[in-house]
């Protein structure tokens, strides 16, 4: 039954005043036992669930977003037709019109909504929502007011209006709905404030978000307290005027202007047809509810808090069955949003004072960007062309994107962000069209900044391009950047690019006139890290002093800005866990006042958070200290001079006019603690430690071995100060001409290694530590000063060193008092350090062989162990190291 017929039957029933009360009373008596459940069934209350992913392929994707999924039985019981519009009403009063679509096997009593639909209506899976067919007419919307954010106020409203009317033609809108459209490659979200129909009726604006949220919270709280209260009883306590004729609950709630009457009944469009006898049932519901309202009002004079809430949220609206849709002739008016939202947005804007450690880069960027945008006439008067582009390059996490956002916020320019891979399309010409749209919009809304992130993915070198799409994209971007200066907005549009692979960019893009300036955003040093930490901890409660902050900045080698931010977050979690561990039942308000970050929290967090550049090559630094190595005090001193002194006392080296040693080579017989010394150095220095085994770099493919060497040094520079440890260097740096392998792989690797250690590009804050037991096989070019400055011979341990080794071993072993340490030292004259440890281990095993419950290691066990473990370094090899030391002139310690 159409809306007109429903009105006609209602009028006929109203004229028969004598029959109305009787019908109402009979209806009320018949429904009294189960009024709440019947009302919920007829109102179409369903449970929200997620939209099914597998939908009919015949349905266009653009149309699938406007569908809701229902079961066939649910649609039949609710009188919902296939493909017809339905009204969704949530508990908080938000309404939206969608199209019903049946799904085979869909569970009954549920409605499938997309994530966007759930967000628009304000529901989540499991919530209750009312689904009703549109019983009435749909008119053309003559006028519509939409809210536009303040940053979009300068857009061409005429073009945006055309885009909205073209893409949303036929969509039924209500006040408070959100409209989504893509304009010049950028998504827009507009809120409908007011709708005026062709009949002259005006649907007013919705309540503010804060009011709606407050009402929703109050409603949820009241519903929890009165969950047993039936819906019919709640509705019966609403205060309605006697002169109003209530319509069916299945019609939507929309605010209307009572002064405006229907003037366009000739263009009404019937949306659904009710069943033949459905109007009679509707009349019974109306009269029954009318009687319930009147009887309840007589017996309940005072309203509870829940009743006043219901009266406020529902009684303030009227019922109407007229809806309005967008057409090509609808007039769209754009209004600015509330200024309160602006103030909230300003709190999260990135500014210059929030960026630490990049003062010199920020100064250069501001000179290039701010002057042309703020004072374009100055450049014109001197005839200086304004820069068109600035390229920021550096490792990930150093702050390139953050700088772009800060510049846009400080200058007040419009920002368009292009993420390289996002605009790439498989369709011919679509990627170039998106680029043209973005540049056209930026030109229209000048001053503007176009920020292209991951520029290397969008514009790689055309020589190595795999397909024609990449070449066309590069050509389009070159043309668009050349066209910036010829536009009316000369100097008002600037392209800001960011990449961590500048060598992969096309050469034509990096020439002056396109990207006029290239600024490196590198890994911060200790002073920069201190500045970053101070900025990050400015609003964080902590107990760190200036000295502790300086210590933390000095120890955070290789950490970039993003790593330090994650480090602060992890330290905060450590502090929170520390407080909750002591007082687990503390309320949240008191916990917030007690949580203060300390240096211990930061040190604990540094064990879990490693520099991002070290994650792919991170190794577990062994827990070996200098005290675990017996003797060798002079070697420890030499290593401290080469590694720790340049970091702790840089002014001393500057005062003396010398450079710290670049490389240290440890050579000597096997088992003399060369690798163990490297482990202790990695642990004691606290530097980033890269352990490289010589054979690991060798690869059977041409060029891969050299690339592995380059990558190793590149990573070391990225996390400087750092140590590269080459174990078994003789396998990697063999003397040139001695390699018999095909293609002279060893020679090429050696050449790459020599270039990296002392080539045109200076190796700064990276120390080379190598170990070998065959120094005669290493190429002489690698052994010269400037590459390997310190060559240290690690001989067999002398008597004093053997005493220290035995003491370290006896410290953790139950040794009997009859064991004579001096005698053991004399008996192990030609033993290496590893062999002495083997003697102690063998003695302990012999004691366990005699008695598995043994508590002491006796002298006889050591005597038997010495006969089992004999020196494995022959006299000839010892003589070889001594002769090599004398002939080569290498100094010993």
Swiss-Prot record:
Keyword Lyase attached: no
Listed result of changing residue 100 to T: In NEDHSB; decreased protein stability; no effect on interaction with AFG2B and CINP; affects cell viability
Record-linked Gene3D superfamilies: 1.10.8.60, 2.40.40.20, P-loop containing nucleotide triphosphate hydrolases
Gene Ontology MF term list: ATP binding; ATP hydrolysis activity; preribosome binding
Disease the record associates with this protein: Neurodevelopmental disorder with hearing loss, seizures, and brain abnormalities: An autosomal recessive disorder characterized by intellectual disability, intractable epilepsy, microcephaly, abnormal muscle tone, and sensorineural hearing loss.
Subunit structure, interactors included: Part of the 55LCC heterohexameric ATPase complex composed at least of AIRIM, AFG2A, AFG2B and CINP. Associates with pre-60S ribosomal particles.
Basic residues composition bias: residue spans: 1-10
Family under the similarity heading: Belongs to the AAA ATPase family. AFG2 subfamily.
Transmembrane segments: none
Cellular component, GO annotation: cytoplasm; cytosol; spindle
Region annotated Required for interaction with AFG2B and CINP, chain positions: 1-237
Pfam family, one: AAA
Subcellular location: Cytoplasm; Mitochondrion; Cytoplasm, Cytoskeleton, Spindle
Catalytic activity of the protein: ATP + H2O = ADP + phosphate + H(+)
Consequence recorded when altering residue 185 to E: No effect on protein stability. No effect on interaction with AFG2B
Region (Disordered): 1-26
Record PTM Phosphothreonine, positions in chain: 272
Alphabetical UniProt keywords: ATP-binding, Chaperone, Cytoplasm, Cytoskeleton, Deafness, Developmental protein, Differentiation, Disease variant, Epilepsy, Hydrolase, Intellectual disability, Isopeptide bond, Mitochondrion, Nucleotide-binding, Phosphoprotein, Repeat, Ribosome biogenesis, Spermatogenesis, Ubl conjugation
Record-given protein name: ATPase family gene 2 protein homolog A
Linked residues for Glycyl lysine isopeptide (Lys-Gly) (interchain with G-Cter in SUMO2): 859
Cited SUPFAM superfamilies: ADC-like (SSF50692), P-loop containing nucleoside triphosphate hydrolases (SSF52540)
Compositionally biased intervals (Polar residues): 11-25
Phylogenetic lineage: Eukaryota, Metazoa, Chordata, Craniata, Vertebrata
């Amino acid at each position: 039954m159409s809306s007109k017929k429903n009105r006609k039957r209602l009028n006929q029933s109203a004229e028969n005043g004598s029959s109305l009360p009787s019908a109402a009373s009979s209806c009320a008596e018949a429904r009294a036992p189960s009024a709440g459940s019947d009302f919920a069934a007829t109102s179409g209350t369903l449970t929200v669930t997620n939209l099914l992913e597998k939908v009919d392929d015949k349905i266009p994707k653009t149309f699938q977003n406007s569908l809701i999924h229902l079961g066939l039985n649910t649609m039949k019981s609710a009188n919902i037709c296939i493909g017809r519009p339905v009204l969704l009403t949530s508990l908080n009063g938000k309404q939206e019109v969608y199209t019903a679509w049946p799904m085979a096997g869909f569970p009954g009593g549920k409605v499938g909504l997309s994530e966007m639909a759930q967000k628009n209506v304000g529901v989540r899976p499991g919530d209750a929502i009312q689904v009703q067919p549109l019983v009435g007419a749909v008119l053309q919307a003559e006028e519509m007011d939409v809210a536009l954010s303040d940053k979009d106020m300068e857009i061409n409203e005429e073009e945006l209006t055309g885009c909205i009317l073209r893409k949303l033609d036929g969509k039924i809108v209500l006040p408070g709905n959100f409209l989504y459209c893509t304009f010049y490659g950028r998504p827009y979200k507009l809120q409908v404030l007011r709708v005026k129909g062709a009949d002259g009726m005006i649907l007013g604006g919705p309540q503010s978000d804060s009011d709606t949220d407050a009402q929703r919270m109050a409603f949820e709280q009241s519903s929890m307290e009165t969950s047993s209260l039936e819906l019919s009883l709640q509705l019966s306590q609403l205060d309605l005027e006697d002169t109003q004729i209530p319509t069916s609950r299945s019609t939507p709630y929309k605010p209307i202007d009572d002064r405006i009457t229907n003037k366009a009944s000739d263009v009404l469009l019937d949306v659904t047809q009710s069943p033949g006898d459905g109007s009679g049932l509707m009349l019974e519901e109306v009269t029954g509810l009318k009687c319930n309202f009147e009887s309840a009002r007589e017996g309940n004079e005072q309203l509870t808090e829940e009743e006043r809430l219901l009266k406020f949220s529902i009684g303030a609206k009227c019922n109407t069955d007229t809806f309005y849709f967008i057409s090509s002739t609808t007039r769209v008016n754009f209004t600015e949003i509330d200024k309160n939202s602006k103030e909230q947005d300003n709190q999260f804007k990135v500014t210059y004072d929030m960026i630490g450690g990049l003062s010199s880069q920020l100064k250069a960027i501001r000179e290039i960007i701010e002057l042309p945008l703020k004072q374009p006439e100055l450049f014109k008067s001197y005839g200086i062309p304004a820069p068109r582009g600035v390229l920021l390059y550096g490792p990930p996490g150093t702050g390139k994107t953050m700088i772009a956002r800060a510049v846009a916020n400080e200058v007040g320019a419009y920002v368009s962000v292009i993420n390289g891979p996002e605009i790439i399309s498989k369709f011919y010409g679509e990627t170039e069209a998106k680029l043209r749209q973005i540049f056209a919009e930026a030109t229209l809304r000048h001053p503007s900044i176009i920020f292209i992130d991951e520029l290397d993915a969008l514009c790689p070198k055309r020589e190595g391009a795999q397909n024609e799409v990449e070449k066309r994209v590069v050509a389009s971007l070159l043309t668009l950047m050349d066209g910036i200066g010829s536009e009316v907005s000369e100097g008002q549009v600037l392209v800001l690019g960011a990449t961590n692979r500048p060598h992969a960019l096309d050469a034509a893009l990096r020439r002056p006139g396109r990207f006029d300036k290239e600024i490196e955003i590198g890994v911060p040093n200790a002073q920069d890290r201190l500045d970053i930490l101070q900025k990050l901890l400015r609003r964080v409660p902590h107990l760190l002093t200036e000295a502790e902050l300086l210590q933390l900045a000095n120890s955070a080698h290789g950490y970039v800005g993003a790593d330090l931010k994650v480090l602060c977050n992890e330290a905060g979690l450590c502090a929170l866990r520390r407080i909750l561990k002591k007082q687990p039942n503390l309320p949240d308000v008191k916990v917030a006042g007690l949580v203060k970050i300390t240096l211990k929290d930061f040190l604990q967090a540094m064990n879990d958070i490693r520099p991002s550049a070290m994650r792919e090559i991170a190794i577990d630094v062994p827990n070996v200290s200098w005290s675990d190595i017996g003797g060798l005090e002079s070697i420890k001193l030499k290593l401290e001079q080469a590694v720790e002194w340049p970091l702790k006392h840089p002014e001393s080296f500057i005062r003396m006019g010398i450079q710290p040693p670049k490389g240290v080579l440890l050579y000597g017989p096997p088992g003399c603690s060369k690798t163990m010394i490297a482990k202790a150095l990695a642990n004691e220095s606290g530097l980033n430690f890269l352990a490289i085994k010589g054979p690991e770099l060798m690869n059977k493919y041409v060029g891969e071995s050299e690339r592995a060497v380059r990558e190793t040094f590149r990573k070391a520079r990225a996390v400087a100060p750092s140590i590269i440890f080459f174990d078994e260097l003789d396998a990697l740096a063999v003397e040139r001409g001695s390699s018999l392998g095909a293609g002279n792989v060893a020679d090429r690797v050696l050449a790459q290694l020599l270039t990296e250690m002392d080539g045109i590009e200076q190796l700064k804050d990276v120390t080379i530590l190598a170990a070998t037991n065959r120094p005669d096989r290493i190429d002489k070019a690698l052994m010269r000063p400037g590459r390997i400055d310190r060559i240290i011979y690690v001989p067999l341990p002398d008597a004093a060193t053997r005493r220290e080794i035995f003491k370290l071993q006896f410290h953790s072993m139950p040794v009997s008092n009859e064991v004579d340490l001096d005698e053991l030292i004399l008996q192990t004259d030609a033993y290496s350090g590893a062999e002495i440890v083997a003697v102690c281990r063998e003695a302990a095993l012999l004691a366990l062989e005699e008695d598995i419950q043994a508590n002491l290691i006796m002298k006889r066990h050591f005597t038997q162990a010495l006969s089992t473990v004999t020196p494995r370094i022959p006299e000839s090899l010892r003589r070889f190291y001594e002769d090599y030391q004398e002939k080569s002139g290498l100094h010993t310690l």
